[in-house]
């Protein structure tokens, strides 16, 4: 039995498109990226909201959120790169994005952004990145690594004391 929540207004799930694409990171690793957009707004040089986490072996699985509808209805491409450090691709994926390998998480996110822009799915002048908590650390890194890729970067409750975290063997 699958329960569906009622969405108020003129919501029609057929109005939205989704796709999983794969990009190649700078070290050759293939990174999955989930995309969603409004059917009437083709993903071509679109404004993009790209969000990431990539920590603690937590998977950023695709899912429905009513809060995204207004953005999608305005032609924004919503992207979630499943970067190393998360749990989407198993334990080794997580290990490749933690502690001294954390740079892979940052590089994966930037490489996904650049790949979507190079493919003309997204416009760099209208790309905004978002991440919270450990994703806030990601936002701090990408803002410094590739400021030309983002019109804005939002770090929600950022976890940014990386040195203490790397030195503490009890933290993931």
Regions found by a protein language model. Name each.
Residues 46, 76, 149-151:
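Short beta-strand segments enriched for Tyr within beta-sheet-rich domains
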